[in-house]
Design a protein with these regions (language model features):
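Short, Lys/Arg-enriched segments at the junction into DNA-binding effector domains
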Residues: 10-15, 126-158
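The feature encodes the CheY-like receiver
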Residues: 24, 67, 95, 113
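Charged docking surfaces used in two-component/phosphorelay signaling
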Residues: 25-33
């Protein structure tokens, strides 16, 4: 089984928004074993409420095909409300146009069903690392970084 990243003083909260009961039960079990705290929403409206609730989840796993809204619509609504929580779209939509649509809507990563649990866990860990690295929490590799220089461009990160 995969390991969580080392700096893990608190449990990572994942919101899983999917209406497939068997899949959510399997994912909840796997994520629990990995040490994540999982909350499930079986429709988009409930997922939207939980995504905006305090404290916000640390990561969101969002299905495209929900009974009331599309995952893309939910993602757009989450983003328009100012929530920056990393979102992974978990879907059967394997078309490039669908991937682009989801990424343009604000999804951070995209995983096509069927998928391997190992790949899902690796993607969640990567999203978690990116979120910690840019959150200013002091946990990221470059947490003390004041300036970022790329080519002729220099950015003050403070």
């Amino acid at each position: 089984m995969a390991q969580l990243p080392e700096p893990s003083d608190q449990t990572i909260r994942i919101l899983l928004v999917d209406d497939e009961v068997r899949l959510t039960e399997l994912l909840r079990l796997e994520l629990d074993v990995e040490g994540y705290d999982v909350e499930v929403a079986s429709d988009g409206a409930t997922g939207l409420i939980k995504a905006r609730s305090q404290p916000e989840p640390d990561l969101i796993v969002l299905d495209w095909n929900l009974p009331d809204f599309s995952g893309v619509d939910i993602c757009q609504r989450i983003r328009s409300s100012g929530v920056t929580t990393p979102i992974l779209m978990l879907t059967g939509h394997d078309d490039i146009a669908d991937r682009v649509k989801a990424l343009d809507a604000g999804v951070d990563d995209y995983l096509v069903k069927p998928f391997s649990i190992e790949e899902l866990m690796a993607r969640l860990r990567a999203m978690q690392r990116r979120a910690q690295g840019f959150s200013g929490s002091g946990q990221g590799k470059d947490a003390g970084l004041t300036f970022l220089a790329v080519g002729g461009l220099t950015i003050n990160t403070q």
